[in-house]
A protein has these predicted regions:
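Catalytic active-site module of serine/aspartate enzymes centered on a nucleophile-bearing elbow/loop
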Residues: 323-361
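Alpha/beta-hydrolase
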Residues: 186-299, 307
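Conserved hydrolase catalytic core segment
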Residues: 121-167
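Conserved acidic catalytic loop of the alpha/beta-hydrolase fold
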Residues: 105-123
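Conserved loop-alpha-helix segment in the C-terminal half of the alpha/beta-hydrolase fold
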Residues: 286-328
């Protein structure tokens, strides 16, 4: 599964560069805010040239991450589809100043501008992590423009810290304190597991002594760097191991884990999470999902911290008219890092069902 040699030859002849082995066409979308300020949005189109039904807009997570960590996820299918990725407002290649210009409404309307610039009547959205909340918001604001949704590592349609999300009344009306406690216990187990993974890898890499345990409590990289006299390179390595241990089930591919650090702008997360409109809108996305008649495909790992098990998504999809859940065993939040073949197969099915297009088209 992957890009054909003939396709690479064709792209090389056309002069398009490649990134992560995938042909890419980069451009900037220029928009003007209500106050007259200009924003240049970085856009990167990966894969084939535009053809009817082959375009998928991909929404990265964060809030405040950027697009490139998702390139390995779409690479096996870039011989069939045109994936349009972009850095959302405030993210790495789409800077805005001040952060006050970042809002949930602005992020949704930037996506609508992108749809218009691409000349598409309807769009298929593939979202990862908090990108799912952007997909939900777009569906709420522009339901007539959505052809289908592919929700990867899908954050549930609820605000953070909401102890009684709107959807519970529909999918789990008898959700009780014991259920909340059980969910909290699953998260505690997950935390112990990723810390164990971190320790095993860090010991193997010589960053920590062989007898290391969390006897001091789990310490930050700053504390560990001081305790074990790490160099900046050591500390960066430890951070990447931690990032991988949290986002994958195995942690084995930590050297290939993309994103984080300078690729993440926490100001974006702060701006969106503190935006009153976001809090209001996120309470209204569940009704929008229930009313949507297009295909919704949810792909999640069994060890994804956004919904461990999963617990909530098996119930949620029963209330969305044309929804289907694919659960991938032994995979975390970055599913393609743990189980690349299984993820590629699930994504191919989801794309065929949401776009109506297959490799033979």
């Amino acid at each position: 599964m992957g890009l054909s040699f003939a396709m690479f030859e064709a792209r090389a002849a056309s002069g398009w560069p490649t990134e992560e082995g995938v042909p890419v066409r980069q451009w900037y979308m220029r928009t003007t805010d209500a106050d007259g300020a200009k924003v240049q949005h970085y856009i990167a189109e990966y894969g084939t040239e535009a053809k009817p039904g082959n375009t998928v807009i991909v929404l990265h997570g964060g809030w405040g991450a950027e697009h490139s960590y998702l390139v390995p996820a779409i690479r096996p299918l870039a011989d069939t589809y045109r994936f349009v990725l972009y850095d959302q407002r405030g993210s790495l290649r789409t800077p805005v100043n001040p952060p006050a210009k970042i809002s949930y409404t602005a992020l949704v309307e930037d996506l609508e501008q992108l749809r218009q610039r691409l000349g598409l009547e309807k769009i298929t959205l593939m979202a990862h992590s908090m990108g799912n909340h952007l997909a939900y918001g777009y569906l709420r604001a522009h339901p007539e423009r959505v052809a289908g949704l592919i929700l990867v590592g899908a954050v549930t349609p609820a605000a953070f810290g909401d102890e009684r999300p709107t959807f519970l009344d529909d999918v789990w009306p008898d959700f009780a304190e014991t259920d909340a406690v059980a969910n909290a216990e699953r998260l505690k187990t997950f935390e112990r597991d990723w810390q164990r993974r971190f320790g095993q890898i860090a010991v193997a890499e010589g960053l920590l002594p062989a007898d290391w345990t969390t006897r001091h409590g789990f310490e930050s990289d700053r504390e560990l760097a001081r305790r074990y006299s790490w160099t900046d390179r050591d500390r960066t390595m430890a951070w990447r191991i931690t990032f991988t241990a949290v986002n994958t089930y195995s942690g084995r591919n930590w050297r290939h884990m993309l994103g984080g650090m300078v690729y993440y702008n926490e100001d974006v997360a702060g701006a969106v999470l503190n935006d009153p409109e976001y809090g209001k809108a996120i309470k209204e996305v569940w009704p929008a999902l229930k009313a949507f008649r297009g295909p919704v495909r949810v792909i999640i790992g069994t060890h994804d911290y956004v919904d461990l098990g999963p617990t909530f998504w098996p119930k949620l999809v029963t209330k969305i008219p044309n929804a289907r859940l694919e659960t991938i065993p032994n995979a975390g939040h970055s599913i393609w890092m743990d189980e690349p073949a299984a993820f590629a197969q699930s994504l191919r099915r989801a794309l065929e069902e949401t776009t109506g297009r297959s490799k033979s088209n």
